[in-house]
Swiss-Prot record:
It is an enzyme of class 1 (oxidoreductase). It holds the Pfam family RolB_RolC. FMN binds at residues 247, 267, 275, 295. Belongs to the tryptophan 2-monooxygenase family. Pathway: Plant hormone metabolism; auxin biosynthesis. The keyword Flavoprotein applies. This is Tryptophan 2-monooxygenase. InterPro entries: Amino_oxidase, FAD/NAD-bd_sf, Flavin_monoamine_oxidase, Glycosidase, Trp_2-mOase.
Length: 755
């Protein structure tokens, strides 16, 4: 039976027609009018049933009532009728209501659920997650733009899921009913209209562990140009900032704008920027090798605030796997992955499974954990309670899982996302190679699962960009700004700080030269290894509480190595070779980078080796960059000789046109970035909130990405810099801008509560 015939059949049996609510755009009005439509339908049906049963000796068993057109009647007995909603896209809705005669496609297996389109407790992403799990299909957000309200018999085939969380951690039951539009089934269409459930809004949004939008705070402060200020009668503090990375420079700059004139920055190295380090080549000034941070997602909204402030808006996509032509090398065989398409067949199961996980979350028994996409949408739509409760459930259930054990639990269990159970070790190894969007994650498989998941939820794996002018241009421009006649860079002293100690009400800085100086406040951004070993801040509880000391001493810093090669030409364009190569051998990840797209004859840049952890540690045995390059080139040539033959430095100059760096042996870094092991999220909490702890203020404040929830990302460095600045202004009698992080009513998580 066609949809139009079904609609006609319904109209023949009772006078109430399906109600058009397309123009209703307010949730409360939609709720009221849908309820009215159901009430009118129920009254009309009751009159019709009474009429037919009264005319027939068989009563409720009358054949006219048992033909499947009345949801209230089953086997001659009255049954309950439930309200449910079919969610469809605009095209399918139009097909259901006004089909053309030529359309014969069967619309079957549609699922109706008991969640109303006016429900504000459920987001579109959660609806999508629920529909995918109940229907077993892959719905897109556009497939849920409209609804058809139906009355359906309680005898209809159904399945119930428990959505976690709901209202401060409780569960919400969601029941789905399978319906077939073209058959006489026990349901009636009552009304149709637009889905008004919450959907994500544009603009910045808070990170999942903080639920506070630092970008919004910075935007609000833009008009005045400062985070806070000091009244004329309040003395300004004398402040030392340890480290001239992005965090230290933001601290110094914001303090100067707030009116703190006596600011000194101590930097142990010979450059500014810390891990924002762009190496420029003599033979190609417009080409830069990003030795530290190199991928910048728009979701890192604080970073983009400062990029825009200092006129660095030129960005282009980073050539991540699958976004450009990519070769995947597995067990000596090459598999080509065309840009924007599905990966090779060998990788379909892990690729589809991971992307299903992002949309559908994880079904454990009959309890559904919110999908990463649903949590992100809750953040974007301002549904902070939903985001908090959803993330707390993940922390409770997976906080003690490593990335490795969580992948095993999710994809090798009874309800794997995508419907296909992964095999071990085959799919396991494929996933290690392919990764989650930005390359293979095999080397960090033993890090905490929630440490990786938060990056996904925060949007840091999406739409990653590279900075055309080199990211170190940002710290350079911050350092070059002049405040009260003196540039920030003039306040930098390139000398190593050996110790930071309390001396009565002051903080004493002891320098490598033997000189000591006293300050009112000190902000330490120099990294965890220096805080523990050089500054000796964790020897006792004079400066920091014991839990903070423990976090500094025990947080895991990741080793990372990079080797860049400047080539005579952009050979990958000349010879139609892939811009990205992922390998399961020694080389791991190769990226071809074009910093001068306007010049097709310009120099090329290849990141021939970007490795983490054990893969990086092995390279430390080969410190000579020419020897290391030769080993990498030989490894690549075994499976991809056509590509490897072009890996020769421009002008055969290995000294100038090959650069490498090992962050683990960098004496001023002690590792590339903090990456928590399983069960160690509470370390990040201790480090991040240290500066905001007004009850334990000693005058020394931590900042930097390693003291945040997002180690290795510029966002965490800026967030903690804001914390330190606010703490100093507030604790020294200054006045902060409204809605600042110090006065924010933080909704904290329980990182130690494990089920």
């Amino acid at each position: 039976m066609s949809a139009s015939s079904l609609l006609d059949k319904q109209c023949d049996h009772f006078s109430t027609k399906i109600v058009d609510l397309i123009m209703v755009d307010k949730a409360d009005e939609l709720d009221r009018r849908v309820a009215a439509a159901f009430s009118e339908r129920e009254a009309s049906r009751e009159r019709r049933i009474s009429q037919i049963s009264g005319e027939c000796n068989a009563g409720l068993a009358c054949k006219r009532l048992a033909d499947g057109r009345f949801p209230e009647i089953s086997a001659g007995q009255r049954v309950a009728v439930l309200s449910a909603y079919i969610y469809v896209g605009e095209e399918i809705l139009r097909w259901i209501l006004e089909p053309e005669a030529s359309v014969r496609t069967r619309v079957s297996g549609l699922v109706a659920i008991d969640l109303a389109p006016s429900c504000m407790d459920i987001s579109r992403a959660q609806l999508l997650q629920t529909m995918n799990l109940l229907s077993g299909k892959r719905c897109a957000p556009s497939d849920l733009s409209h609804f058809v309200a139906i009355s359906i018999s309680e005898t209809a085939r159904s399945r119930t899921l428990q959505m976690a969380p709901y209202e401060e951690g409780s569960l919400k039951s969601v029941t789905g009913f399978t319906v077939i539009i073209e058959e006489a089934v026990p349901f009636d269409m009552v009304a149709y209209g637009r889905n008004l459930m919450l959907k994500a809004s544009a603009g910045s949004f808070p990170t999942i562990d903080l639920l506070y939008d630092y970008r919004l705070f910075l935007d609000k402060c833009s008009d005045s140009g400062r985070i806070g200020f000091f009244p004329e009668d309040v003395p300004r503090p004398k402040v030392a900032v340890i480290g001239a990375g992005i965090s230290g420079l933001v601290v110094a700059s914001e303090l100067l704008h707030a009116g703190v004139d006596d600011v000194t920055i101590y930097e142990a190295g010979d450059r500014v920027g810390g891990k924002l380090w762009s190496h420029a080549f003599k033979d190609a000034p417009g080409v830069v090798a990003e030795m530290g941070a190199m991928r910048f997602p728009p979701a890192a909204s604080c970073l983009f605030f400062f990029l825009e402030r200092y006129g660095l808006s030129s960005m282009r996509p980073f050539p991540n796997p699958g976004t450009v032509d990519t070769d995947l090398v597995y067990e000596g065989c090459r598999y080509m992955w065309k840009a924007g398409q599905q990966p090779p067949k060998l990788f379909h199961r892990v690729y589809s499974g991971w992307h299903a996980f992002l949309k559908d979350g994880f079904l454990e028994g009959d309890i559904v954990l919110a999908s990463p996409d649903a949590i992100t949408e809750a953040l974007k739509s301002g549904d902070i309670r939903r985001a908090h409760d959803s993330w707390q459930i993940w922390l409770n259930r997976f906080g003690r899982e490593s990335f490795s054990s969580a992948i095993e639990r999710i994809f090798l269990g009874t309800h794997p996302p995508g419907g296909e159970t992964w095999s071990f070790p085959h799919d396991w190894d494929l996933f290690k190679l392919m990764g989650i969007g930005s390359g293979g994650f095999g080397p960090v498989f033993e890090s905490g699962f929630t440490e990786i998941l938060r990056l996904v939820i925060n949007g840091y794996e999406e739409n990653q960009r590279m900075c055309s002018e080199g990211i170190s241009e940002l710290p350079r421009r911050i350092a070059s700004q002049v405040v009260n006649g003196v540039s920030v860079s003039q306040r930098i002293r390139h000398v190593q700080v050996r110790a930071i100690e309390k001396e009565k009400t002051k903080i004493k800085i002891r320098l490598k030269s033997g000189i000591s100086e006293l300050y009112d406040k000190v902000v330490v951004t120099s990294g965890l290894a220096n805080i523990q070993l050089r500054h000796c801040l964790t020897c006792d509880t004079t400066i920091f509480r014991a839990p903070v000391n423990q976090a500094v001493d025990n947080s895991h810093m990741t080793g990372s190595s990079k080797l860049f090669l400047l080539t005579e030409r952009k050979f990958w364009f000349d010879h139609m070779l892939p811009s990205c190569v992922l390998m399961d051998g020694f080389a791991k990840a190769v990226y071809c980078l074009d910093y001068e797209p306007q010049d097709p004859n310009g120099k090329g840049l290849v990141l021939i080796s970007y490795t983490w952890e054990d893969d990086s540690h092995k390279l430390l045995a080969v410190p000579d960059k020419k020897e290391r390059l030769c080993l990498l080139r030989d490894a690549i040539s075994k499976s991809f000789p056509v590509f490897a033959q072009h890996l020769v430095p421009a002008c055969a100059d290995y000294d100038q046109n090959v650069v490498q760096h090992d962050w683990l042996t960098d004496e001023n870094a002690g590792g590339r970035f903090k990456l928590n092991r399983r069960g160690e999220d509470f370390y990040s909490e201790e480090l991040f909130f240290q500066a905001l702890d007004t009850t334990n203020d000693t005058g020394v404040y931590l900042a930097g990405c390693s003291c945040s929830f997002t180690g290795g990302w510029v966002e965490g460095a800026i967030q903690t810099a804001c914390n330190a600045v606010c703490a100093i202004i507030h604790n020294c009698g200054g006045i902060l801008a409204k809605d600042n992080p110090l006065k924010h009513p933080w909704k904290r998580y329980n990182y130690r509560n494990r089920n």
